[in-house]
């Protein structure tokens, strides 16, 4: 799928992916949205993952916890503003607990990418969360995984 660039507000975090407090980071982003009056019905929750946990030390893994908004304000405190690159992405829809995402990624990188003959793109991939873990049973959580490809 070819995507247009996405304008986001984000908080940059560094630690093991399974130790991130995603909900607290999104709450801080929503506080910024309220303060800056940036409410919009089409907000997307995404995380950009910059590192491979099989290569990078766990305490050095970099993540951007993001809200995609039709208009963004100015950077303020820990909240930054940037563009997630557009381009060609392989998109996978996964339903189930977040704990199983690692196995999904293993399958994508070890089997799907080589079997389909794609090469990885130069930008980081990201996940888009289509429902909320506080209101959804783990087996019903829906995550879209976006892998940049050439």
Task: Go through each PLM region and give its residues.
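A solvent-exposed interaction/effector surface
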Residues: 1-150
């Amino acid at each position: 799928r070819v995507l247009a660039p996405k304008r986001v507000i984000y908080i940059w975090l560094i630690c093991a992916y399974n130790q991130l407090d995603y909900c607290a980071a999104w709450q801080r982003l929503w506080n910024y949205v309220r303060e800056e009056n940036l409410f919009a019905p089409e907000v997307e929750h995404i995380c950009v993952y910059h590192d491979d946990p099989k290569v990078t030390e766990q305490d050095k893994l970099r993540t951007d916890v993001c809200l995609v908004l039709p208009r963004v304000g100015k950077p303020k405190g820990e909240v930054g503003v940037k563009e997630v690159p557009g381009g060609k992405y392989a998109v996978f829809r996964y339903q189930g607990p977040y704990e199983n995402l690692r196995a999904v990624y293993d399958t994508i990188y070890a089997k799907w990418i080589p079997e389909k003959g794609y090469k990885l793109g130069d930008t980081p991939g990201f996940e888009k969360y289509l429902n909320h873990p506080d209101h959804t049973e783990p087996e019903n959580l829906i995550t879209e995984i976006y892998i940049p490809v050439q």
